[in-house]
Amino acid sequence: MTKLHKYLPQRTLSKIVGWLATREWGLLTQWAIRLFIRHYGINMQEAQYPDIGHYPSFNAFFTRYLKRELRPVVEEPRAIASPVDGIISEMGQIKGENLIQAKNHHYTITALLGEDPSRASQFLDGDFFTAYLAPKNYHRIHMPLDGRLIEMIHIPGKLFSVNPASVQTVPRLFARNERAVCLFETENGLMAVILVGAMLVGSINTVWHGTVVPTAEGIAVHNYREKNIKFKRGEEIGHFKMGSTVILLFPKNTIQWNPNCQPKGTICYGENIGTVSLIEVA
């Protein structure tokens, strides 16, 4: 199936699924949601509203909130909080400007950040963290550290599936798919939170911009340096309307990963995935 991706009408299929997901068809919608829950083994007792009747559409269900007490955000001052629930695809050090996508598959920071060498240079030999959100997962994205939004770059692209099979077979997948690169200024330096789109994902949404829509001009750069948009660690910054992928980038020698976090391991948002190394704690 993964070999067929380049031949499929990715954007058309995604628009159709996105449209269907907004429909409010009463009992039919509830029946479909129940099938989805059963197929993926979703624990609705974690949801803020476990009753299926609370969700008038698939989109409302996909973007459901969880009970806050089930996802406490790490409290240690220097800790980095996981931005999502999901599976760690890969993580570790950036070798020069090369990141690992999967075994025998690499891509570059420059390509990931829209072919902008000046942005890429800030993360050379830094660290990266890639998490996959499966359809069953909670789809909201949260802030790993306290920070101020300075820029968002929307990069149009393909909509390949980002499931594990595709990641292992589609070259440079994350640098080819549509994505929103969100750059934050933190006490620890620059941090990138990258929201990668995928086939059948209704849309990428951020709390400051709403739905991120491709433009005819191609890459769109949104400057927020004068807006003073700040987030605390653990605050929501966006969501997907299906599963997808989130990538974190940090500059060289600024963080250390939690040794308990390893590729293929599962994570929950708010968990400790690492520690910053520049903040002086009083």
From Swiss-Prot:
Localization per Swiss-Prot or TrEMBL: Cell membrane
InterPro entries: PS_Dcarbxylase, PSD-B, PSD_type1_pro
Mode of membrane association: Peripheral membrane protein
GO BP field: phosphatidylethanolamine biosynthetic process
Pathway entry: Phospholipid metabolism; phosphatidylethanolamine biosynthesis; phosphatidylethanolamine from CDP-diacylglycerol: step 2/2
EC assignment: 4.1.1.65
Site, Cleavage (non-hydrolytic): residue positions: G243, S244
A Pfam family this chain is assigned to: PS_Dcarbxylase
GO molecular function: phosphatidylserine decarboxylase activity
Modification note: Is synthesized initially as an inactive proenzyme. Formation of the active enzyme involves a self-maturation process in which the active site pyruvoyl group is generated from an internal serine residue via an autocatalytic post-translational modification. Two non-identical subunits are generated from the proenzyme in this reaction, and the pyruvate is formed at the N-terminus of the alpha chain, which is derived from the carboxyl end of the proenzyme.
Catalytic residues in the record: D85 (charge relay system), H142 (charge relay system), S244 (charge relay system), S244 (schiff-base intermediate with substrate)
The UniProt record lists the keyword Lipid biosynthesis: yes
Keywords linked to the UniProt accession: Cell membrane, Decarboxylase, Lipid biosynthesis, Lipid metabolism, Lyase, Membrane, Phospholipid biosynthesis, Phospholipid metabolism, Pyruvate, Zymogen
Cofactor(s) annotated in UniProt: pyruvate
Chief place where the protein resides: membrane
Cofactor, free-text remark: Binds 1 pyruvoyl group covalently per subunit.
Top class in the EC scheme: lyase
Catalytic reaction equation(s): a 1,2-diacyl-sn-glycero-3-phospho-L-serine + H(+) = a 1,2-diacyl-sn-glycero-3-phosphoethanolamine + CO2
Cellular component terms per the entry's GO annotation: plasma membrane
Modified residues (Pyruvic acid (Ser)): S244
UniProt record similarity statement: Belongs to the phosphatidylserine decarboxylase family. PSD-B subfamily. Prokaryotic type I sub-subfamily.
Role of this protein: Catalyzes the formation of phosphatidylethanolamine (PtdEtn) from phosphatidylserine (PtdSer).
Subunit record text: Heterodimer of a large membrane-associated beta subunit and a small pyruvoyl-containing alpha subunit.
Stated name of the protein: Phosphatidylserine decarboxylase proenzyme
Organism, as annotated: Coxiella burnetii (strain RSA 493 / Nine Mile phase I)
Upper taxonomic lineage: Bacteria, Pseudomonadati, Pseudomonadota, Gammaproteobacteria, Legionellales
Gene this chain is encoded by: psd
